[in-house]
From Swiss-Prot:
Originating species: Pseudomonas aeruginosa (strain ATCC 15692 / DSM 22644 / CIP 104116 / JCM 14847 / LMG 12228 / 1C / PRS 101 / PAO1)
Keywords: Cytoplasm, Elongation factor, Glycoprotein, Protein biosynthesis
CDD domains: S1_EF-P_repeat_1, S1_EF-P_repeat_2
Lineage summary: Bacteria, Pseudomonadati, Pseudomonadota, Gammaproteobacteria, Pseudomonadales
PTM (free text): Glycosylated ar Arg-32 by EarP: arginine rhamnosylation is required for EF-P function and rescue of polyproline stalled ribosomes.
The organism's place on the tree of life at top rank: Bacteria
Pathway: Protein biosynthesis; polypeptide chain elongation
Sites where a glycan is attached: R32
Assigned GO CC terms: cytoplasm
Subcellular locations according to the entry: Cytoplasm
Entry function: Involved in peptide bond synthesis. Stimulates efficient translation and peptide-bond synthesis on native or reconstituted 70S ribosomes in vitro. Probably functions indirectly by altering the affinity of the ribosome for aminoacyl-tRNA, thus increasing their reactivity as acceptors for peptidyl transferase.
Name of the featured protein: Elongation factor P
GO MF annotation list: translation elongation factor activity
Length: 188
């Protein structure tokens, strides 16, 4: 058991029998009151978020989640199937892939990380950057080049994002999966 003040952002704690990831932890000690830790939490099973305040010396149980490298295999409605290097298959529901679905596409070779809790996959994490191909975008407007000019592009899997004006259909682009934003064009 660890005290609440020992937890940092990114760590996982067992709170009321469920795994909660700490997204933000702020320690506060005022003059007369006891020290407290204000935490922003996200439930790893339901995806629900909350903010709560713990006394600095409240005891919480840390959880260490298992992780395994996997690759996307196929979609069997409503399950996405991932496979590890030993050909074990892991099924995960569409709802548990919030934020990741935008970048999943058939034939992708990116190495992902499956996160396990009690021997069950609860989420999949993509690498921080991935490369995807532009399926469609409007041509750039000549002369409209003051500042950082962006336009909408559609990827092969149907996802849309803002890219630089010089990007064209068929270009490969690098995307930051944490923010979902375009980073750069990849040289062929």
């Amino acid at each position: 058991m660890k005290t609440a003040q020992e937890f940092r952002a990114g760590q996982v704690a067992n709170i009321n029998g469920a795994p909660w990831v700490i997204q933000k932890a702020e320690f506060n000690k005022s003059g007369r009151n006891a020290a407290v830790v204000k935490m922003k939490l996200k439930n790893l099973l339901t995806g629900a978020g909350t903010e709560t305040v713990f006394k600095a010396d409240d005891k919480l149980e840390p959880i260490i989640l298992d992780r395994k490298e996997v690759t996307y295999s196929y979609f069997a409605d409503p399950l996405y199937v991932f496979m590890d290097s030993e050909f074990n298959q892991y099924e995960i529901e569409k709802d548990d892939l919030e934020g990741v679905l935008t970048f999943i596409e058939d034939g992708m070779t990116d190495i992902c990380e499956a996160v396990f809790y009690n021997d069950k996959v609860i989420s999949v994490e993509l690498p921080t950057t991935i490369v995807r191909q532009i399926a469609y975008t409007e041509p750039a407007v000549r002369g409209d080049t003051s500042g950082k000019v962006m336009k909408t592009a559609r990827l092969n899997n149907g996802a849309e994002l803002q890219v630089s004006a010089f990007c064209e259909i068929g270009d490969s682009i690098e995307i930051d999966t944490r923010t979902g934003e375009y980073k750069s064009r990849v040289k062929a």
